[in-house]
């Protein structure tokens, strides 16, 4: 997958659960409705936690990929 166009980036590299999701929650709150956030993480638990976060809060997971132990996610914030 190529890098999707995004409005903001959250670099959670080196952080472990629950920090990436806590930071994700803060960054999504600050994002405009319909905005896209790119998340960069190294914690494997984000493969489970970030999709569940999106489903639970109604945001759209546009894409995810893994590159040599780095996990990338693109999330579109739901409309207000």
From Swiss-Prot:
Localization (cell): Cytoplasm
Protein family (similarity comment): Belongs to the sulfur carrier protein TusA family.
Record flagged with keyword Cell inner membrane: no
Record's protein name: Sulfur carrier protein TusA
Organism ancestry: Bacteria, Pseudomonadati, Pseudomonadota, Gammaproteobacteria, Pseudomonadales
Function comment: Sulfur carrier protein which probably makes part of a sulfur-relay system.
GO cellular component terms listed in the entry, alphabetical order: cytoplasm
BP terms from Gene Ontology: tRNA wobble position uridine thiolation
Main location: cytoplasm
Keywords: Cytoplasm
Gene: tusA
One Gene Ontology term of the molecular function aspect: sulfur carrier activity
Active site: residue positions: 17 (cysteine persulfide intermediate)
SUPFAM superfamilies registered for this protein in UniProt: SirA-like (SSF64307)
